From Swiss-Prot:
Keyword Cell membrane tagged: yes
Pathway connected to this protein: Pyrimidine metabolism; UMP biosynthesis via de novo pathway; orotate from (S)-dihydroorotate (quinone route): step 1/1
Role, per record: Catalyzes the conversion of dihydroorotate to orotate with quinone as electron acceptor.
Subunit: Monomer.
Record protein name field: Dihydroorotate dehydrogenase (quinone)
Gene that encodes it: pyrD
Active site, renumbered: S178 (nucleophile)
Phylogenetic lineage: Bacteria, Pseudomonadati, Pseudomonadota, Betaproteobacteria, Rhodocyclales
Enzyme class: oxidoreductase
Catalysed reactions listed for this entry: (S)-dihydroorotate + a quinone = orotate + a quinol
Organism: Dechloromonas aromatica (strain RCB)
Pfam families: DHO_dh (PF01180)
Homology family: Belongs to the dihydroorotate dehydrogenase family. Type 2 subfamily.
UniProt xrefs under HAMAP family: DHO_dh_type2 (MF_00225)
Keywords, alphabetical: Cell membrane, Flavoprotein, FMN, Membrane, Oxidoreductase, Pyrimidine biosynthesis
Length: 347
């Protein structure tokens, strides 16, 4: 495919500018009926997770399409599911630019975006205008808190978002692990986590009764956790009967990129350098959960074998974002084909 040439052009631009142009390009190809032409056929590998039937276990991680502006174009690339967001109750600009940095030598990306988004109401407009969910496509909506909301009031923002997106989401992801919103990761700790999960579970059950359907919830966690924290999170997820966990978000560590250009930029590191760390956390989480709820493995997937390693470490589904930037649409078909082979062998 031509993506290596396209990437060369994109990488000559500022990262955020290139992102915007790339997303518009996907929309244009979709409108012209050409999106399928740039994507290879994707192997069928149906799986059932969280009570949802996925055509394949390969998902787009949150962050690429924050406002749900590009759902239909992205869907044509063969993803088994798409996650949009992170979205907050009110629109916000996020952190000052520049805030997105590539580390090509390590196939890494550092971002300090800060949940820049157009607000939950705008996202819902886009979701309702998209064809993908109407045709039964699995669409996750990732929710967060506004930067101006005090951390002790964070639950209010998550509850507002959950209430609004519930009827339009296939599943909802609760993001408490971005390193780019002040104190957000404090919500992963002990009483704060317990309180938040309890309130969200109560709201989920209330909404299930209101709408006559159960929409599963996943919690997205950080890779920068010790064994005790991983066990505590697993216990909380079981206690509050959450439906899944996404492991993991970006890391604050700079292991593997030391001394490289942009490596000292503030923000979360994703891409190949986070693979080992995120997979290690996922493996420990899988042991702690003992199969009681599914794991969506994300972090550093740059090829089919990386995704297979996530599955072997206990994941039921996988997602990527940075890999898509470095590898393009071919990564979707490669990962789907590898996982179809891995899952056939395990049956």
């Amino acid at each position: 495919m031509l993506y290596p040439l396209i990437r060369k052009f994109f990488f000559s631009l500022d990262a955020e500018t290139a992102h915007g142009i790339g997303m518009k390009g996907i929309d244009l190809m979709n409108a012209a009926g050409l999106a399928c032409a740039v994507a290879k056929p994707v192997a069928a590998c149906p799986v059932e997770v969280m009570g949802l039937k996925f055509p394949n276990p390969v998902g787009l991680a949150a962050g690429l399409d924050k406002n749900g502006d590009h759902i239909d174009g992205l869907a044509k690339l063969g993803f088994g599911f798409i996650e949009i967001g992170t979205i907050t109750p009110r629109p916000q600009d996020g952190n000052p630019k520049p805030r997105l940095f590539r580390i090509p030598e390590a196939q890494g990306i550092i971002n300090r975006m800060g949940f820049n988004n157009a607000g939950v109401d705008k996202l819902l407009e886009n979701v309702r205008a998209a064809e993908f969910p109407k045709k039964g496509g699995i669409l996750g909506i990732n929710i967060g808190k506004n930067a101006t909301t005090p951390i002790e009031k964070a639950a209010d923002d998550y509850l507002i978002c959950l209430d609004k997106v519930y009827n339009d989401a296939s599943y909802v992801t609760v993001n408490i692990s971005s390193p780019n919103t002040k104190n957000l990761r404090e919500l992963q700790k002990d009483e704060a986590l317990d309180d938040l999960l309890a309130q969200l579970k109560a709201k989920q059950l209330q909404l299930a009764e209101q709408y006559g359907k159960y929409v599963p919830m996943a919690l997205k966690i950080a890779p920068d956790l010790d064994d005790e924290q991983i066990t505590a999170i697993a216990d909380a997820l079981r206690r509050h009967r959450f439906d899944a966990v996404i492991a993991t978000n970006t890391t604050l560590s700079r292991e593997g990129v030391e001394g490289m250009p942009n490596a000292t930029e503030t923000g979360g590191l994703s891409g190949k350098p986070v693979f080992e760390k995120s997979t290690a956390v996922q493996k420990k989480l899988s042991i702690a959960l003992a199969g009681e709820l599914p794991i969506i493995g994300v972090g550093g997937i740059m090829g089919g074998e990386d995704a297979a390693e996530k599955i072997r470490a206990g994941a039921s589904l996988v997602q990527f974002y940075s890999g898509f930037i470095y590898r393009g649409p071919d990564l979707v078909s490669e990962v789907a084909e590898t996982l179809a082979h891995v899952m056939r062998k395990s049956v």
